[in-house]
Amino acid sequence: MRHRILMLLLGLAVLVTAGCGFNLRGTTQVPPELQKLLLESSDPYGPLTRAIRQQLRLSNVTIVDDPMRKDLPALRIIGSSENQDTVSIFRNGVTAEYQLVLHVQAQVLIPGHDIYPIRVNIFRTFFDNPLTALAKEAEAEVLRQEMRDQAAQQLVRKLLVVHAAEIKNAQENGDTLTSSKRATGAAKMADVEEINIGKPAVSTPAQ
């Protein structure tokens, strides 16, 4: 009986979270215009590209593996770099703490529109223990993978910023086009008025 009650409560919890739009942690509601795109990378099977691909799929984005498609938006990974800086040292001068930095540069290409550059910087602090060299290397690799995953999440989130900028540009172009049409119409009306003013008055013969 207790088992049935627990199962019922669990089912209700699932329904409630589904009804309120609950999403998995780290996922992003990508706009429909960007839910199908190309993923371009010079290292398509590298750990960073794999993390980005996984994050896109978690966000319900369909990745089209056809570079000949020019009608779809594209997320292009320009490059990435990792730096390691010393933050603190022991009394004997040996490094005690590092800061790991991951820089990622990318672009979003919208067909027939603009190219939007994206930059992501991820920081992590790593404590160096010279007595546990093997554990240190394993921990550093775990941190680097976490940084790649976080960079992938931020890249996908910035698709929302790109979409907002695209809407703003479309509105501004529409306003500019409307203003241009109005100016053209006013100029035509002025030409018509000038022509009418320049015409001599036509007199009607008296009967």
From Swiss-Prot:
Alphabetized HAMAP family for the sequence: LPS_assembly_LptE (MF_01186)
Membrane association type: Lipid-anchor
GO MF annotations in UniProt: lipopolysaccharide binding
GO CC annotation: cell outer membrane; transporter complex
Pfam families, per database record: LptE (PF04390)
Keyword set, alphabetical order: Cell outer membrane, Lipoprotein, Membrane, Palmitate, Signal
Keyword Ribosomal protein: no
Lipidation (N-palmitoyl cysteine): 20
Similarity-based family: Belongs to the LptE lipoprotein family.
GO biological process, one term: lipopolysaccharide transport
Organism: Yersinia enterocolitica serotype O:8 / biotype 1B (strain NCTC 13174 / 8081)
Identification of the protein by name: LPS-assembly lipoprotein LptE
Function description: Together with LptD, is involved in the assembly of lipopolysaccharide (LPS) at the surface of the outer membrane. Required for the proper assembly of LptD. Binds LPS and may serve as the LPS recognition site at the outer membrane.
NCBIfam families: PRK10796.1
InterPro entries recorded: LPS_assembly_LptE (IPR007485)
